Amino acid sequence: MTYLELLALLALQSVVTGATFPDETITEWSVNMYNHLRGTGEDENILFSPLSIALAMGMMELGAQGSTRKEIRHSMGYEGLKGGEEFSFLRDFSNMASAEENQYVMKLANSLFVQNGFHVNEEFLQMLKMYFNAEVNHVDFSQNVAVANSINKWVENYTNSLLKDLVSPEDFDGVTNLALINAVYFKGNWKSQFRPENTRTFSFTKDDESEVQIPMMYQQGEFYYGEFSDGSNEAGGIYQVLEIPYEGDEISMMLALSRQEVPLATLEPLLKAQLIEEWANSVKKQKVEVYLPRFTVEQEIDLKDILKALGVTEIFIKDANLTAMSDKKELFLSKAVHKSCIEVNEEGSEAAAASGMIAISRMAVLYPQVIVDHPFLYLIRNRKSGIILFMGRVMNPETMNTSGHDFEEL
């Protein structure tokens, strides 16, 4: 029996491009994945990269045929596209996102690790190179320690050493023949940076009303801001949306948070592709006081259960049709891992994926205050195309690494 190991890796923070592609296709799929993840852990932080997973699934689709390929296209929302159009989009996006003239750094790297002597169709290898610029490496999976070290070194190299130990020797054995690896790295600086000397310790109130102390950044400036109703017509039914651009204005981080007394779980069920588009079209540039936590999130997700819940099942069974990849029978996906990391600090973001109190008046002010001192959801998106590169939520900053600049305790 033959196994295909897919280890979809990501370390990242934001970016996308203006490729012509129905942005709601990827956005809807991103929202579906987010909703599944929040359903598996009510009080847990969430972090994943729709971009990284889309690239990994694109590589799988390239090797699939028949009902297996049809199932992947249906799950990803590609049915309205002509066959193969999605590959051209992913290629064009990758080329634009990683262009040297961009004011951010983004690396997209793909690699196919193949068992020595294992036959992979030449046409598949050519297409893999053309659409994903993928490397092909021949290894001996029976030497699992050496293979794991080789893959982890490759990942570290492409994520600026932010993501380590993606795989372990136990992930491979004598029947493993293929491993597909996808790595995404992003580093961007805020268009308007937070001054480190303004960072102070602040109380963050979790949904269970307990409090933790966190480093809170602060600045006053012009940002895209809007207030929206959750439809409840109650006093706490208004929530805030803030968009903070990175240098170059192509990429931004969008934050959504309810009023402090309203749990994030009240807002999350409203999340849809159309709502995100409404946020983007409705926020207006204005002066805002922003209090934003400095945080780091690293998360590893077993994609197998999530992809199955989203309708992708055939690639995980021995009847999978991956004959575009290899003539070998009983080739299927036995493992799918997604690892991501994001750091948000005073300068901006980097991904490969601090005590005292400050007094803030919540009384009438000259302009809006966005005080991110309770659970919130966030996404990093390309402002032109609307495509989401990174998505997540912060429920409990106590579990996250908040290291960074030293800050003053008040």
UniProtKB/Swiss-Prot annotation:
Residues glycosylated per entry: N157, N321, N401, S403
CDD domains: serpinI1_NSP
Gene coding for it: Serpini1
Organism: Mus musculus (Mouse)
Name this polypeptide is given: Neuroserpin
InterPro entries tied to this protein: Serpin_CS, Serpin_dom, Serpin_fam, Serpin_sf, Serpin_sf_1, Serpin_sf_2
Cellular localisation: Secreted; Cytoplasmic vesicle, Secretory vesicle lumen; Perikaryon
Summary of the tissues where the protein is detected: Detected in neurons in embryonic brain cortex (at protein level). During embryonic development mostly expressed in CNS. In adult expressed in brain and much less in spinal cord, heart, kidney and testis.
Glycoprotein in keyword set: yes
Cross-referenced Pfam families: Serpin
Gene3D superfamilies per UniProt: Alpha-1-antitrypsin, domain 1, Antithrombin, subunit I, domain 2
Domain of life: Eukaryota
Family from the record: Belongs to the serpin family.
Function: Serine protease inhibitor that inhibits plasminogen activators and plasmin but not thrombin. May be involved in the formation or reorganization of synaptic connections as well as for synaptic plasticity in the adult nervous system. May protect neurons from cell damage by tissue-type plasminogen activator.
Signal peptide: 1-16
Keyword list, A-Z: Cytoplasmic vesicle, Glycoprotein, Protease inhibitor, Proteoglycan, Secreted, Serine protease inhibitor, Signal
Sites marked Reactive bond: R362, M363
Gene Ontology MF annotations: serine-type endopeptidase inhibitor activity
